[in-house]
UniProtKB/Swiss-Prot annotation:
It catalyses: alpha-D-galactosyl-(1->3)-1D-myo-inositol + sucrose = raffinose + myo-inositol. This is Probable galactinol--sucrose galactosyltransferase 2. GO terms for molecular function: glycosyltransferase activity; raffinose alpha-galactosidase activity. Its EC number is 2.4.1.82. Keywords: Carbohydrate metabolism, Glycosyltransferase, Transferase. It is an enzyme of class 2 (transferase). One of its GO terms (cellular component) is plasmodesma. It comes from Arabidopsis thaliana. PANTHER family: GALACTINOL--SUCROSE GALACTOSYLTRANSFERASE 2-RELATED (PTHR31268:SF32), PTHR31268. Transmembrane segments: none annotated.
Length: 773
């Protein structure tokens, strides 16, 4: 069978479905279609060079007049988003790019379908490719090994290009095509998600930073539990390990970041976590902390922090008891793209002091001994931080890709051996060296940290996690980070976590909590109502700039089992500045913005609605409490000030008869209200002809008689407690919970049925709710 592609080079232009995407393609550029039978949607861009070198920077064509969004590393550890329309707008260290164009084969002008084209720079052999732009509007590839001894004169599969009409499916299929080609990583859908995701958690970091102690852990768990939101997973962050005590060097120019050169001197816990009661010398202090958390506070999962290199400054060479890891001082060398973006205090420190790098041949032994000790203490997993440091240490070791892959493979092998629940959170890890080497790790931090004391950071954080999740969410479930429940932006952050599909955890100091807020996220049993997918921007937000353009709201969509959810956020006023190379507020008083939502903003709503869906929906707005019957194709307007939000739950309308329709809403006082719905079943219960009336059902329509014969029994399984809501076009004849008739209220103006579900002692309990209509 002949292979045909919708991506080709014609007259020195890169053409996608009839539309020129890039012009002036150089002669040394090679286009290779994906292998396979029939029509293919993807091709690889490669190149040949006159000289063999360890670093090549070269153009692949000119981009002008097409909107794009990209994810780029603004500093070594983290990505954020950038929007533009020409090559010079593409930042250094761009690892993902999505372009918008029109299909000029299938239509003309505005009638032509929109085509979305993904560019994924890849790893090839010992080299890594990234994109960047120049002042000529050329897209360049920066192709490097990170080791001057590792050279090449060609690369045949440097960037994968994939196109189609659904942007989310295009991204998904492009990563899956690269997975088949590279065979070095797995797509998120193939990975086991750790169970902690469905439980509320607490992290010690912003509560104590490195001053965390055993007593502090106990205080934090106790404080949250007493307020009715018990943490079921715990992260003991940086501060528990044995590290060297270094006096500051008076002659060292780098002082502020001196802590980052500190090295690990033992795999066990430090003195702060040692037992004060030494009656049982066989039990470690860390084990006592974990046992206390699980037995006294009913915590299910405990994770411990460590850096990929052991600690920020690695493992101290020849440290007592750690000699067998063959740690040696190495000095980081950053890639040109990273150096062109934001400087980092960690790297300033390590450039002076060096990092104690465990011999790559011994790194599995290091991880295995560390993790087996942690597992013996009852630890269930690890948060592995500072990962991208490894890419800077490849000189003399085969380069950045080889070194990163050896560390990642050793890490995943140790986690598989020691932690049965695939217990790993990957952090400070936004490089493709690691992403394209991860076959097992299933959780990735989605952005730079939550910074409670930085006013510029909060809108930036929400925008970054959403756009980064477009790319990262194909590899792992994005983690949108901890936040503070008692904070001026707490509700804004909480609402974002509800639509993010991510773990929900806080870093509150003991006693500093907003329990009214937390109870909108956390059920009394400590579980959470988590959306099912990575939260991502809606289609109409993909190429807008909701942090900088002054006009756009950010809309984030996700799915529950039977509904969609769309969160809308005003994120204007701050962003990463390419001139100052840091986050900054560029508008101190961003204006009030107006936008709208539609049912199909939740991109997969038709899949949960079923084949017989008319397109009409019931929309529940969480903050306002409004219930709206939304016809197919219609929209709901909204207005938000900066740092304001709204959550819309979209429930496809189920037509029971010509004049009776129904839609579940869920627990109306929870942020992710419709995430409580576990099942819905509608059974007709009469053969009699139901009463009919002429005209469309609306608030002005006459109600059917309460003495009518029942038409259908709607059965809904609901997880959680509190006020349960549903839409019914007619007042129900009766409602029951666990087969016992219960009181309910009915607002005939909007069709809202509400009833109360009691608290139960059983975890993850599902109430059986019956509504007779």
């Amino acid at each position: 069978m002949t292979i045909t592609s919708n991506i080709s080079v014609q007259n020195d232009n890169l053409v996608v479905q009839g539309k020129t995407i890039l012009t002036k393609i150089p002669d040394n550029i090679i286009l290779t279609p994906v292998t396979g039978n029939g029509f293919v949607s993807g091709s690889f861009i490669g190149a040949t060079f006159e000289q063999s070198k360890s670093l090549h920077v070269f153009p692949i064509g000119v981009l002008e007049g097409l909107r794009f969004m990209c994810c780029f590393r603004f500093k070594l550890w983290w990505m954020t988003q950038r929007m533009g329309s020409c090559g010079k707008d593409i930042p250094l260290e761009t690892q993902f790019m999505l372009l918008e164009s029109k299909d000029e084969v299938e239509g003309n002008g505005d009638d032509a379908p929109t085509v979305y084209t993904v560019f994924l720079p890849l790893l090839e052999g010992q080299f890594r490719a990234v994109l960047q732009g120049n002042e000529k509007n050329e897209i360049e590839i920066c192709f490097e090994s990170g080791d001057k001894a590792v050279e090449t004169s060609q690369g045949t599969h440097l960037v994968y290009v994939h196109a189609g009409t659904n942007p989310f499916e295009v991204i998904r299929q492009s990563v899956k095509a690269v997975e088949r080609h590279m065979q070095t990583f797995h797509h998120r859908e193939k990975k086991k998600l750790p169970s902690f995701l469905d439980w509320f958690g607490w992290c010690t970091w912003d509560a104590f930073y490195t001053d965390v102690t055993a007593e502090g852990v106990d205080e934090g768990l106790k404080s949250l539990s007493e307020g009715g939101t018990p943490p079921k997973f715990l992260i003991i962050d940086d501060g528990w390990q044995q590290i060297e005590n270094k006096e500051k060097d008076e002659n060292c120019v780098v002082q502020e970041g001196a802590q980052f050169a500190t090295r690990l001197v033992g795999i066990k816990e430090n003195a702060k976590f040692q037992k004060s009661d030494q009656k049982d010398t066989q039990v470690s202090g860390l084990k006592s902390v974990v046992d206390n958390a699980k037995q006294r506070h009913n915590v299910k999962q405990v994770y411990a922090w460590h850096a990929l290199a052991g600690y920020w400054g690695g493992v101290k060479p020849a440290a007592s008891g750690m000699e067998h890891y063959d740690s040696a001082l190495a000095y980081p060398v950053q890639s040109p793209g990273v150096l062109g973006n934001q400087p980092d205090i960690v790297m300033d420190s390590l450039a002076v002091h060096g990092l104690g790098l465990v011999n790559p041949k011994k790194v599995f032994n290091f991880y295995n001994e560390l993790h087996s000790y942690l597992a013996s203490c009852g630890i269930d997993g690890v948060k592995v931080d500072v990962q991208n440091i490894i890419e800077t240490l490849g000189a003399g070791l085969g380069g950045r890709v080889s070194l990163t892959r050896s560390y990642q493979q050793a890490l995943e092998a140790s986690i598989a051996r020691n932690f049965t629940d695939n217990g790993c959170i990957s952090c400070m890890c936004h490089n493709t060296d690691g992403l394209y080497s991860a076959k097992q790790t299933a959780i990735v931090r989605a952005s730079d940290d939550f910074y409670p004391r930085d006013p510029a950071s909060h809108t930036i954080h929400i925008a970054s996690v959403a756009y980064n999740s477009l790319f990262l969410g194909e590899f792992m479930q994005p983690d949108w980070d901890m936040f503070h429940s008692l904070h001026p932006t707490a509700e804004y952050h909480a609402a974002a976590r509800a639509v993010g599909g991510c773990a929900i955890y806080v870093s509150d100091k003991p006693g500093n909590h907003n329990f009214d807020l937390l109870r909108k996220l956390v059920l009394p049993d400590g579980s959470v109502l988590r959306a099912k997918l990575p939260g991502r921007p809606t289609r109409d937000c993909l190429f807008a700039d909701p942090a900088r353009d002054g006009i756009s709201l950010l809309k984030i969509w996700n799915m529950n089992k039977f509904t969609g959810i769309v969160g809308v956020f005003n994120c204007q006023g701050a962003g990463w500045c390419k001139e100052t190379k840091k986050n900054q507020i560029h508008d101190t008083s961003p204006g009030t913005l107006t936008g709208s939502i539609r049912a199909d903003d939740a991109d997969l709503i038709s899949q949960v609605a079923g084949e017989d869906w008319s397109g009409d929906s019931i929309v529940y707005a969480y903050r306002s409490g409004e219930v709206v019957r939304l016809p197919k194709g219609a929209s709901i307007p909204l207005t938000l000030k900066v740092l304001e939000y709204e959550l819309f739950h979209i429930s496809p309308l189920k037509e029971i008869t010509e004049n009776i329709s129904f839609a579940p809403i869920g627990l109306v006082d929870m942020f992710n209200s419709s995430g409580a719905i576990e099942s819905i079943d509608i059974n007709h219960v009469t053969d009699k002809n139901p009463e009919f009336f002429d005209g469309e059902i609306s608030s002005a329509s006459p109600a059917l008689s309460d003495n009518r014969s029942p038409t259908a029994l709607v059965s809904v399984s609901v997880r959680g407690c509190g006020r349960f809501g549903a839409y019914s076009s007619q007042r129900p004849l009766k409602c029951a919970v666990e087969s016992t008739e219960t009181d309910f209220t009915y607002d005939a103006e909007v069709g809202l049925v509400t009833l109360n579900l009691p608290v139960t002692r059983e975890e993850m309990f599902r109430w059986h709710v019956e509504i007779l209509v």
